[in-house]
Each structure stands twice: as structure tokens, then as C-alpha cells.
């Protein structure tokens, strides 16, 4: 099986608003929209939108046993693990186990994430 496919559409357009889902436990802070997923491997591409003023400090830092790539689409996000503001255009290819977060944003932020949960080391 391969990742799901879609024709051109704009997930950031107001008409697509109803497709975004609150992230469990972070309903007032962030929401997500899965763009594509491979049901066999679990590989997925999704957008995460952090609302203006969001602060995930209470959730602590994160790491995964698999690699992921992130790209800041809009806004800015502070990654406390790196003591760095990530702004529109920033990109990272994270290896398995890399610690990131917690995050906070003053103006809001949209992050494109491509994850490979089947590629654990």
C-alpha cells in the first residue's frame, strides 16, 4: 500500500477549517490535519497549528523512536530544547531519539511534519 493521495486543495483556506482536529489534551493550544498516511507503514504527513499564545511547557519535551522532518510554514515557534525561535522557512530532519520541545508561540505557527514511524533503529 502507499500513502493516501489528494488532488490540489488548500488546507489553510478558511473553507478547510472543519477538517482540522484538536489535539487530545491540547485542545486550547493546537490542532492537526493529517494530509496523507500509509496505513501499512504508518508513515504520515500532517500539519500542526499552534494557536497564538500556546505554551506546551506542561507537557514537557518529546522524542520519538523514528525519524521525522519538520518545516515551519508560517508564524514562529520557540523550541525550548534548542533555545531557538523557529520561523517561517526553518526546516529540520530529526533523527530517532532527538529531543525537541516543549514549544511556545506568541503569534501562532503552522508546522508541516513528515514522520516515518516504521523506520525505528
Question: What is the role of each PLM region?
Answer:
Residues 1-44:
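A short, N-terminal "cap"/entry segment at the start of jelly-roll beta-barrel domains
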Residues 28, 96-121:
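Ligand-binding loop in jelly-roll beta-barrel domains
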Residues 33-64, 83, 95-99:
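Conserved short histidine dyad/triad with adjacent acidic residue
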Residues 43, 68, 107:
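Conserved catalytic motifs of the protein kinase core domain
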Residues 48-50, 71-77, 112:
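Short, well-ordered beta-strand segments in beta-rich or mixed alpha/beta enzyme
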Residues 58-80:
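Glycine- and acidic-residue-biased ligand/ion/polar-headgroup-sensing regions
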Amino acid at each position: 500500500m502507499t500513502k493516501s493521495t489528494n488532488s490540489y486543495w488548500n488546507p489553510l483556506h478558511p473553507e478547510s477549517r472543519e477538517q482540522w482536529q484538536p489535539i487530545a489534551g491540547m485542545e486550547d493550544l493546537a490542532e492537526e490535519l493529517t494530509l496523507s498516511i500509509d496505513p501499512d507503514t504508518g508513515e504520515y504527513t500532517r500539519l500542526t497549528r499552534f494557536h497564538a499564545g500556546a505554551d506546551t511547557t506542561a507537557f514537557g519535551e518529546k522524542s520519538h523512536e523514528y525519524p521525522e522532518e519538520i518545516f515551519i510554514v508560517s508564524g514562529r515557534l520557540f523550541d525550548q530544547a534548542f533555545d531557538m525561535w523557529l520561523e517561517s522557512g526553518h526546516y529540520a530532519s530529526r533523527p530517532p531519539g532527538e529531543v525537541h520541545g516543549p514549544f511556545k508561540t506568541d503569534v501562532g505557527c503552522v508546522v508541516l511534519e513528515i514522520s516515518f514511524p516504521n523506520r525505528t533503529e
